[in-house]
Amino acid sequence: MKKVLLVLAIALMAIPALAQSDSYTRGRGFFIRPELYGGLFMNVGYQISPYVQLSVGPGCLLFINQSGSHISVDFSAMAHGGVRVYTSDNPWAGMIDYHAGVFKNGKYLAQRHSLVGGASYKDLDFGGGLQIYFGPNAEVLAYGALVTVGYNIRFYKH
């Protein structure tokens, strides 16, 4: 795990130097971002600067459960929100993302928190990180790795 975090840290420092462009900017304005993020999510948000975007949206979490030799797949609807920060306004940029959400787990509401580091090329964001699920009384239900791929559809000139 330490090696993965080291690679992500090096990538975040190196990516802004890979490409410089005066013709591309992330700009400011509204966007939607369909995304695979431990499930399927639709983010609706606002790019408040070329470096920061806020988003909220519905999603469908995917759970893969293993008990002995039995594997089951479950889905759960979820509402979430978060912030994504870019390291530059170039076509290539490093990206850090934090999202938190609520979903129904059996009879009670549970929370999901995720922290992702990665890269962005123009409107395509991709990365990996960690997620953790909490139940009632802050009981840890599960945790693990997370991979994300999303595409920003922007409703403003950039």
Mark where each language-model region is:
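Short glycine/proline- and aromatic-enriched beta-strand/turn motifs that initiate or cap beta-hairpins
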Residues: 19-63, 68, 148-150, 154-158
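Repeated loop/turn-to-beta-strand initiation elements of outer-membrane beta-barrel proteins
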Residues: 51-56, 89-94, 123-128, 155-158
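Sec-dependent N-terminal signal peptides
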Residues: 4-15
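Positively charged n-region of N-terminal signal peptides that target proteins for export
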Residues: 1-4, 19-20
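Residues on the lipid-exposed face of transmembrane beta-strands in outer-membrane beta-barrel proteins
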Residues: 40-46, 58-60, 77-85, 98, ...
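Residues that define the transmembrane beta-barrel architecture of outer-membrane proteins
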Residues: 28-30, 36-40, 62, 71-79, ...
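A short local loop/turn or secondary-structure capping micro-motif enriched for an aromatic residue
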Residues: 63-65, 134-137
